[in-house]
């Protein structure tokens, strides 16, 4: 809750700095013109209780109330899914950097048990990006993802630089 509050109130051009330590969290949502800096030894550890994650609808109506807007999905279909550990949705100029770790900790929950069966909603991604621009992930490690690790949809100018993905083969 505190980390999301810091992200939500971060001023334009500001940085949310996460020092070394382990921080249990569910879904975090970034906003435009901000940086999330994970110091070496900082671990954002995903919550193992799926009921702590918001459910995102697969499709939303657009502002003109005629067209639809794809928000999330499963296997290419617009289906309700849990929000990811890190969500970058309809924003621009976002940086996630440092030498810290996003650890979904999925192996210690039930995320990988019968993974093709929907339980409440479809599994989240570690980093979910939708309809965003100028996004950079730099230097971080992402591991033990619930399902897809890095999932960009309609993202322009995405830089993935010097980062690591560590997942078991059966994740």
Predicted regions, residues:
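Extracellular/periplasmic carbohydrate-active domains that bind, remodel
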Residues: 1-171
């Amino acid at each position: 809750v505190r980390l999301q509050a810091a992200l939500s109130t971060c001023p334009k051009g500001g940085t949310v700095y996460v020092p070394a330590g382990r921080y249990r969290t569910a879904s975090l949502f970034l906003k435009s013109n901000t940086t999330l800096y994970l110091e070496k030894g900082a671990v954002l550890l995903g919550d193992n209780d799926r009921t702590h994650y918001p459910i995102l609808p697969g499709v939303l109506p657009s502002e003109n109330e005629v067209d639809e807007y794809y928000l999330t999905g499963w296997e290419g279909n617009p289906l309700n899914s849990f929000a990811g550990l890190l969500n970058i949705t309809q924003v621009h100029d976002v940086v996630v950097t440092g030498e810290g770790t996003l650890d979904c900790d999925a192996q210690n929950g039930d995320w990988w048990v019968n993974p093709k069966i929907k339980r409440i909603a479809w599994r989240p991604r570690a980093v979910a990006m939708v309809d965003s621009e100028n996004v950079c992930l730099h230097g971080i490690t992402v591991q033990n993802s619930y399902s897809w690790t890095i999932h960009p949809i309609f993202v322009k100018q995405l830089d993935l630089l010097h980062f690591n993905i560590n997942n078991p083969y059966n994740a």
